[in-house]
From Swiss-Prot:
Pathway: Cofactor biosynthesis; 7,8-dihydroneopterin triphosphate biosynthesis; 7,8-dihydroneopterin triphosphate from GTP: step 1/1
Quaternary structure, from the entry: Homomer.
GO cellular component, one term: cytoplasm
Enzyme class name: hydrolase
Keywords: GTP-binding, Hydrolase, Metal-binding, Nucleotide-binding, One-carbon metabolism, Zinc
Domain of life where this protein originates: Bacteria
HAMAP family tied to this protein: FolE
Gene label: folE
Catalytic activity: GTP + H2O = 7,8-dihydroneopterin 3'-triphosphate + formate + H(+)
Protein name as catalogued: GTP cyclohydrolase 1
Entry-linked CDD domains: GTP_cyclohydro1 (cd00642)
GO MF term set: GTP binding; GTP cyclohydrolase I activity; zinc ion binding
Keyword Ion transport appears in the UniProt entry: no
Amino acid sequence: MDTQKIEAAVKMIIEAVGEDANREGLQETPARVARMYQEIFSGLGQTAEEHLSKSFEIIDDNMVVEKDIFFHTMCEHHFLPFYGRAHIAYIPDGRVAGLSKLARTVEVYSKKPQIQERLNIEVADALMEYLGAKGAFVVIEAEHMCMSMRGVRKPGTATLTTVARGLFETDKDLRDQAYRLMGL
């Protein structure tokens, strides 16, 4: 990541909105923003393979559900945050991931400029590809600051997105069971 370019760009934005980039409260802002971007965009170019490839053998194929995984990310359209909770269900095929690995999977894909629909897809596809799940179902509910603080200005509005892979695509009863276990 080119932090010098980020700092220069932030300084230009500060000046472009009519502020003094040398004012006491703004002097360090370009460097702070560059450090923040290094942190919140640390998922760029990464996948969840390293997390999901560490799995444990299991005999049965009962559904695994982890819900209320908090995340935050940046909307790629306005570079404003959106945040919320991810709910994940999957059907193992002989292997299960450690519970923290599901949260880490959400984290990897949320640490980059993102849209909610793609975040759903990337998490579900990672479970299928790297864990070898028989099915994956991901529900994300989030509040978007680009809707809350600008434009339509409707704070508190939740957007829900879902994606189903494998067995969840074809089995409505399985999806319904996942919804119930997620409390949705």
